[in-house]
């Protein structure tokens, strides 16, 4: 009998509500038993998404996962990550590009055709593989890899047409996932050593698009590395920690931040023996609110876990096998990839969103100072947890900079615009607009920049 004790756990399994929310999609591709799982998927909205597989396939759905079509099958690739910058332009990353150097794939037509990114468009060393992608807006996307080294960070500011690559192996052993709030601020996770026996959990933070990185967390234990990131709000985020089987530590942890990634603290979720049978070795982590989330594993058919209190306690969820990625489209809909694809629908929240829309669910205050130079504060208020997108628009309707794109909790918030565009370049004096969009409504304010 497996000797597993979840820390601070109440042994009441939440089958009721959770089983109604998560469902396995019957027509989704199933990973072969020898490959165990699909590593990533990405949805632009509630119906349109892409799934990548370890055998080099990219699948597309336009009906919320009811049906799937194969868009690409490249047997030379091990597809590890995928992201879309807009409805047409997407990027997929290959984990094992050692010999063919086919590390990046791109599409300009929503996946009708995919092509290998020409290495001549990559400035710097060509990465050997990628594990994570983070798309910020229609022009900006970041990537990193690999989980077993060497460690590379890549970025594009022109929709994937050209790339910059940075070899970070002198200071980092492995890079696995990353998350950017905007074109400047982001975090990246992995391990201190490319050899798992010597690796410690690592979190890096940047405020200048990855020109430089600050180490904000290093784990105390060896045989651990960061795996996946989830930010349900601007300030609250979570990181799963994968633990190597047979490691000495008998307690497994995850990380949490409450200040937007500047500092992190670990929380235990499981006590176990040191045998492989009893290791959870978490991979996927995904929170739809600051307190409600899930965590997955691929070791020995471990169950997906669920928390309702921000990770203080965990129970077995009623879905998922080998879950590696969990993504949420809005506050009532999400998808997860593992042995197959799973879909989350909170019908209560969806019905409220559809039938009880109130005109005053959000407010966007005038920025201050206004006019401004060089930066300005833009306050806004949410009356409930919402998916929030905040963009700076010029007078021609073009998006200059994206300041927020994700779930945020109810209450008062603010963002800061530094008078720069998505590439970090200073914009000229003139009239600009701040547009706040949620699932229910949008508000726009005029902003004056004076140089």
Give names to the regions the model predicted.
Residues 3-12:
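Sec-dependent N-terminal signal peptides
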Residues 17-30, 56-72, 103-121, 154-167, ...:
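Asp-box/BNR beta-propeller loop motif
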Residues 31-46, 51:
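Beta-strand-rich domains and repeat architectures in extracellular enzymes and scaffolds
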Residues 36-40, 78-83, 127-133, 173-179, ...:
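Repeated scaffold domains used in trafficking and secretory/extracellular systems
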Residues 47-51, 88-92, 139-143, 184-188, ...:
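Entry beta-strands of beta-propeller and related beta-repeat scaffolds
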Residues 96-100, 147-150, 192-197, 243-248, ...:
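Short glycine/acidic-enriched loop and turn motifs that connect beta-strands
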Residues 324-349:
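Blade-level signature of beta-propeller repeat domains, shared across WD40, Kelch, NHL, RCC1
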Residues 357-368, 372-451:
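C-terminal outer-membrane/trafficking sorting elements
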């Amino acid at each position: 009998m497996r000797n597993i004790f979840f820390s601070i756990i109440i042994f009441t399994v939440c089958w009721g509500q959770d089983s109604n929310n998560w469902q396995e999609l019957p027509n989704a591709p199933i990973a072969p038993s020898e490959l165990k799982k699909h590593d990533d998927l990405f949805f632009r909205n509630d119906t349109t998404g892409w799934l990548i597989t370890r055998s080099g396939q990219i699948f597309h759905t336009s009906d919320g996962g009811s049906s799937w079509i194969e868009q690409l099958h490249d047997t030379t690739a091990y597809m590890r990550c995928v992201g879309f910058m807009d409805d047409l332009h997407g990027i997929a990353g290959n984990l094992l590009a050692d010999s063919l150097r086919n590390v990046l794939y791109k599409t300009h037509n929503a996946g009708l055709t995919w092509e290998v990114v020409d290495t001549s468009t990559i400035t710097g060393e060509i990465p050997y593989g990628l594990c994570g992608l983070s798309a910020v807006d229609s022009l900006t996307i970041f990537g990193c890899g690999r989980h077993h080294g060497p460690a590379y960070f890549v970025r594009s500011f022109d929709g994937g047409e050209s790339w910059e690559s940075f070899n970070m192996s002198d200071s980092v052993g492995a890079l696995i996932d990353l998350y950017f709030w905007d074109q400047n601020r982001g975090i990246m996770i992995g391990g201190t050593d490319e050899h798992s026996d010597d690796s410690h959990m690592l979190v890096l933070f940047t405020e200048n698009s990855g020109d430089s990185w600050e180490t904000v967390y290093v784990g105390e234990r060896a045989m651990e590395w960061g795996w996946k990131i989830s930010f349900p709000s601007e300030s609250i985020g979570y990181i799963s920690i994968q633990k190597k089987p047979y490691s000495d530590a008998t307690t497994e942890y995850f990380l949490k931040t409450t200040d937007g990634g500047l500092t992190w603290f670990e929380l235990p979720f499981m006590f176990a023996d040191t045998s492989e049978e009893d290791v959870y070795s978490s991979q996927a982590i995904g929170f739809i609110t600051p307190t409600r989330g899930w965590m997955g594993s691929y070791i020995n058919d471990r169950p997906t876990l669920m928390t309702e209190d921000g990770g203080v306690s965990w129970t077995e969820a009623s879905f998922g096998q080998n879950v590696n990625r969990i993504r949420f489209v809005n506050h009532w809909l999400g998808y997860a990839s593992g042995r197959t694809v799973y879909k989350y629908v909170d019908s209560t929240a969806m019905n409220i969103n559809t039938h009880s829309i109130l005109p005053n669910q959000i407010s966007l205050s005038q920025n201050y100072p206004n006019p401004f130079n060089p930066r300005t504060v833009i306050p806004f208020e949410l009356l409930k947890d919402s998916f929030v997108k905040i963009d700076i628009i010029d007078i021609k309707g073009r998006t200059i900079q994206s300041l927020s794109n994700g779930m945020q909790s109810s209450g008062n918030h603010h963002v800061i615009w530094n008078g720069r565009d998505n590439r970090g370049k200073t914009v000229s004096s003139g009239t600009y607009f701040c547009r706040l969009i949620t699932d229910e409504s949008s508000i726009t304010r005029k902003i004056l920049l004076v140089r």
